[in-house]
Amino acid sequence: MKNKYYPLRSSMDELSTKNDNEIDLEKGPLPEYNSEDGNTLPPYSENINLKDPKQMGQNITKLFNWNKSTTPPDYDENRLPITDEGNNPPNTHRENHSSGTADNSSPFLIKLIISFTPIFVLNVPAVCYLTYKDALFKDYGKDEWVYFGVWCAICLMSFISLWCFYETWTKAVKVTVIFLAQCVKVTVIFLAQCVKVTAIFSAQCIKVTVISLAKCVKVIAVGLYNSKKDLVVTIWLAWVVICFILFGCVKDGRLNLNKALICSTSSISAALFFILLLVCIPIWTLKHMLFGLFQVLGVQSCVVIVTKGLMYLFDKHIDATGYEIEASSLFVIGNFLFFYEMERPGALKRMPKFIRNGIASFLGGIANAFGGIANAIRGANDNNDIPLGEMEVESEV
């Protein structure tokens, strides 16, 4: 369906165009008036004589010939809806103010309350403080009453100023509050965006770091496995798990072991892991590593038992410094013995024999020293046993 637009022009519009007369849409066109003819009424006499507004509206409608039948045939009614309630024309009523401007002034009571509110808020803390100190209107002298009067005068002048310039300062406060609210809003949005960006960046950094570490561990594990290091990584992981279990049991109180011993054993695993990262260890078999670890633990246990026995024998207790010294000693001894055993297999097995030979050599040296002292004493005694006659003969010769 083609929509054609026809201008809404009535016969009255054409008449006004011809006569160059302006028509008041509210009152309608001016009918012809003939003063000589008594039958002709003056303009708008019908509306003046009618007291009912509805009848006036009907007369105006008749003057305009307002009816839907005047609509062009091809005009779409949806474009300009026309109400037909009592054949009334569209509402063309315009509000007219007698003064011409809207009254924006606030009521007197509201101005009074709002102007007094700042003074009240300013004085409430002072009154509360003086009441708390029990100094409100108590033991006031001349100076105190003068100060009180000056303060009341200041408050009164402030109240009068606020009341007189109510419109100005309320607008200023309103603008300031809106500005501060916008600043807070912008700041909150900016901080939220910063937090969001920081969180996303941190998450990406953590993700990249975890992926990189996983790749490094994978590369190291594959490299160690391909380099025929028999179960080295597996042994280290198992050893770390054992150390964590021991630490957890000691901390929980379900296992009573020497903390220094546990520290030393865990230090071995840490040193082993460091060397594994460098990939500079020889080919250690599972049997060799287990024997080395257990032998080191045995030596450390012997050291701990001897230390505890001596402390118990002399009725001494090890304080925190003593435990630190013991842990440091076991750390050095444990790592030295472990790596010495790894580099020289069987060194710990030969150690008792070496210690025994050393002790035997030391005791043999002591025995030889005592033998030399005995021989010297014996030689001195032999010189004292020479006969007196032989000594005289020798003197004569």
From Swiss-Prot:
GO cellular component terms given for this protein: ascus epiplasm; cytoplasm; endoplasmic reticulum membrane; vacuolar membrane
Composition-biased stretches (Basic and acidic residues): 11-29
Record-linked InterPro entries: WTF
Record-annotated membrane-spanning stretches: 108-128, 145-165, 175-195, 205-225, 230-250, 266-286, 290-310, 320-340, 357-377
UniProt-listed Pfam families: WTF (PF03303)
GO biological process, one term: meiotic drive
Superkingdom, natural source: Eukaryota
Region (Disordered) location: 1-41, 65-102
Keywords, alphabetical: Cytoplasm, Endoplasmic reticulum, Membrane, Toxin, Transmembrane, Transmembrane helix, Vacuole
The protein's role, per its UniProt record: Promotes unequal transmission of alleles from the parental zygote to progeny spores by acting as poison/antidote system where the poison and antidote proteins are produced from the same locus; the poison component is trans-acting and targets all spores within an ascus whereas the antidote component is spore-specific, leading to poisoning of all progeny that do not inherit the allele.
Family the entry assigns: Belongs to the WTF family.
Self-association and partners: Homomer. Forms protein aggregates. The two isoforms can interact with each other and with themselves. High sequence similarity is required for their interaction.
Protein name, as recorded: Meiotic driver wtf28
Native source organism of the sequence: Schizosaccharomyces kambucha (Fission yeast)
